[in-house]
């Protein structure tokens, strides 16, 4: 746990008073089950707490950020932000995947890369941070790690440009469409990706984003806005 404490201190200015609580947040049930005699606590209860505070803080942010959005739109956007896949991405950004304690079987089966385990650990960490500090510290962490991607539009793509581009290009038959990363810049928890979209090996658009998914959408948007003539 010392390496985790160093990451938290250096990247997020977080120092846990209760080190045992932090360890519990990163202990999966599979690890606790394999060490029953040691009576090790797992992170499910902390996950429950973290989920609640995350929902509250994201709801508060969206309510204040978008005063004209109806409740339905706010709920959909919140669901996109706090879904399993998104939380797993945030966990990876924070390097949390390196520190989760897994049982041997879970480790061998690829549990360290499983979105559900990573997302649960992220929520458990938020729960532990709430108990060790306060809701203000959790809010500070969320605003540092999550909100920049929200404001970059990663969870609010008005148009699915990748699908739209594919439909335009394949109207007369199948064509080979491929997206590739040109470059990655920035620290692990705040990367920026440059991506290009290629049709039959020819680059037809480029885009940038705080995730590969967002960068791909931007590249597709760039290609669509250029018009089909540039794609042939």
From Swiss-Prot:
Superkingdom per UniProt: Bacteria
Catalytic class of the enzyme: hydrolase
Keyword annotations of the record: Cytoplasm, Endonuclease, Hydrolase, Magnesium, Metal-binding, mRNA processing, Nuclease, RNA-binding, rRNA processing, rRNA-binding, tRNA processing
Binding of Mg(2+), residues: 47, 120, 123
Listed cofactors: Mg(2+)
Active-site residues (renumbered): 51, 123
GO cellular component: cytoplasm
Gene Ontology biological process terms, A to Z: mRNA processing; regulation of gene expression; rRNA processing; tRNA processing
InterPro entries (UniProt xref): dsRBD_dom, RNase_III, RNase_III_dom, RNase_III_sf
Pfam families membership: dsrm, Ribonucleas_3_3
Enzyme Commission code(s) on record: 3.1.26.3
Subcellular location: Cytoplasm
Domain DRBM: 160-229
GO function term, MF aspect, one: ribonuclease III activity
Reaction(s) this enzyme catalyzes, per UniProt: Endonucleolytic cleavage to 5'-phosphomonoester
Segments forming domain RNase III: 5-134
Family: Belongs to the ribonuclease III family.
Protein's job: Digests double-stranded RNA. Involved in the processing of primary rRNA transcript to yield the immediate precursors to the large and small rRNAs (23S and 16S). Processes some mRNAs, and tRNAs when they are encoded in the rRNA operon. Processes pre-crRNA and tracrRNA of type II CRISPR loci if present in the organism.
Assembly and interaction partners: Homodimer.
Protein name in the entry: Ribonuclease 3
Gene transcribed to yield this protein: rnc
